[in-house]
Amino acid sequence: NLMSQPRTREILTKTTVDHMAIIKKYTSGRQEKNPALRMKWMMAMKYPITADKRIMEMIPERNEQGQTLWSKTNDAGSDRVMVSSLAVTWWNRNGPTTSTIHYPKVYKTYFEKVERLKHGTFGPVHFRNQVKIRRRVDVNPGHADLSAKEAQDVIMEVVFPNEVGARILTSESQLDNNKREEEELQDCKIAPLMVAYMLERELVRKTRFLPVAGGTSSVYIEVLHLTQGTCWEQMYTPGGEVRNDDVDQSLIIAARNIVRRATVSADPLASLLEMCHSTQIGGIRMVDILRQNPTEEQAVDICKAAMGLRISSSFSFGGFTFKRTSGSSVKKEEEVLTGNLQTLKIRVHEGYEEFTMVGRRATAILRKATRRLIQLIVSGRDEQSIAEAIIVAMVFSQEDCMIKAVRGDLNFVNRANQRLNPMHQLLRHFQKDAKVLFQNWGIELIDNVMGMIGILPDMTPSTEMSLRGVRVSKMGVDEYSSTERVVVSIDRFLRVRDQRGNVLLSPEEVSETQGTEKLTITYSSSMMWEINGPESVLVNTYQWIIRNWETVKIQWSQDPTMLYNKMEFEPFQSLIPKAVRGQYSGFVRTLFQQMRDVLGTFDTVQIIKLLPFTAAPPEQSRMQFSSLTVNVRGSGMRILVRGNSPVFNYNKATKRLTVLGKDAGALTEDPDEGTAGVESAVLRGFLILGKEDKRYGPALSINELSNLAKGEKANVLIGQGDVVLVMKRKRDSSIL
């Protein structure tokens, strides 16, 4: 009894309550409070471990030194055996071995991490103040970006294939991953639960909200503890890249290119969707990546909105992500006069609001009232980045002194030559030159506040004065941490609005930064051919004609107008000098009409070569051309109407077409009896002889032709109800 011993009696009766809390802490609950101590104390005992009875058959009672490895006495309250810690040593040295073949496969992410670190290079350590801001980052390099639910199904399928519960793997990525894992993990002896944990690392993106200064891709985040402290940073170059970072990077580039291209087309939204659906990134459909990838970037979010996916509720202005943290406002249209007396119609936000602003190189906290900046606290990597943030905040505040600081007219246009909206007009104006804005803003005396200093109109720091309401802080402003996604709508011009009608994103917000994608981006849409310049347009146009020759051929003879209006010929028009587009088009269309009228002069090579020139609205003129000019390689190059040129070269011997020296595909042409180079085949393996000839019976459908013998003639119905007489060729051959 504790009360009978004087010392314990004293503790239990006289201890103050706060000490009682400590006693309680160490004596209550099932959670071990001091694991290290507990471990030392346990290991000091003779038999600290219990094991299943089968251990007695697998391990001798004594080791080579004669020390006892297990005791016959049962563990109190169970039928397990008491085992010495020496038994573990014996097992490690003499126990059964197992195949290690599956370890690198199951622990793939760890093995890969070791390789990346082995080949990584660590540079010097710099001591300086680190402006870290919390960002949502990917902490798991080398994952496949499946959703948690999708991954769970794959894991169950691989690890417990015979379990009950129907799981249907639907998405392409699920099936690919499942097949690969099942092949790699045949006869695997590693505990299923371990395999499941490791598979999860391979399949799912794990994000954490961490303080970061510097690189945010997952191969940097995995060494965050080695590369940045509170007052130091260690330079580091990863020893390898991982696909998930490459996907994120390439997705942003593809999305930016697509949004930029869509903006200038007649129907931006329809074009954007067409391009998203026909683009592949690293061999995976872009729309599949968009559905799974949580990357938040303006262009990516516009593409997601177009697909009807939810996106973050923050909005973008001047390349900064704004998140309202308190307050509210109503919008009213107001007319204001610039310093140049130009009238602008702006939507004024009336009311007090607070925002966080997060950009790539600077962050800020902004407090504003109606057309008035109350306070702006900025932090950034350098003077330039801080200035960018200040300009954006000043424009966003809609203050009168900002509008009055405009010198000259505002007439900025977007890629499609449409005027920008007034807020973006102002932004572009001051991004070009903000001197007057800063000069007119006004300055004030400042109090000495820890961690804050002033900034003067010339962007130099000061401890006495500062731009009115503006301060520079040593501390960064954290990115908005919530992963909440909202339903949005998108209009024809790619403006994305939330359900209250606030504009969250527009093409003006898409960065003009050009980068080189890490993964191959394949834009199948003809709208993207011009992304790699005029040469690519030329090659792609001709490749497209050759790939689709079967249908092009029939349209050429049946419904040329529809063929001439194909969007695939649109990019090509930019290569033809403006002044002659209409003349060329009229000339080639007339030439083609003559070919159709005079049966038997169907020249495949010539049709392919001249077809792209028919897309412009034709001008009727008597002009004849022996060559047509296209602007490539910085100058006009000629395509000969009859014959080869460096631009368009058809080699009869190899039957291959080269465009500007690049292979554009094979033309398996078949110049028939006698008329070399003259083609009159519209149907593969048949020669068109002329108009319908009743002597050869009723018109057959194209499918019925297969029964004809070589050299036999028949009438056949093609295209829009026209009937022509054809003959089955005497040699087996095909045109293309």
From Swiss-Prot:
Q: A GO molecular function for this record?
A: RNA binding
The UniProt entry lists the main location of this chain as virion
Pfam families assigned to the protein according to its UniProt record, in alphabetical order = Flu_PB2_1st, Flu_PB2_2nd, Flu_PB2_3rd, Flu_PB2_4th, Flu_PB2_5th, Flu_PB2_6th, Flu_PB2_7th
Q: Does the keyword ATP-binding apply?
A: no
Where's the motif Nuclear localization signal? 728-731
The places in or outside the cell where this protein is found are:
Virion; Host nucleus; Host mitochondrion
Q: Which InterPro entries match?
A: Flu_PB2_2nd, Flu_PB2_6th, Flu_PB2_C, Flu_PB2_CAP-bd, Flu_PB2_middle, Flu_PB2_N, PB2_helical, PDB2_C
Top-level taxon: Viruses
Gene Ontology cellular component annotations, sorted alphabetically: host cell mitochondrion; host cell nucleus; virion component
Q: How does it assemble?
A: Influenza RNA polymerase is composed of three subunits: PB1, PB2 and PA. Interacts (via N-terminus) with PB1 (via C-terminus). Interacts with nucleoprotein NP (via N-terminus). Interacts (via N-terminus) with host MAVS (via N-terminus); this interaction inhibits host innate immune response.
The protein's name is Polymerase basic protein 2
Q: Which organism is it from?
A: Influenza A virus (strain A/Guinea fowl/Hong Kong/38/2002 H5N1 genotype X0)
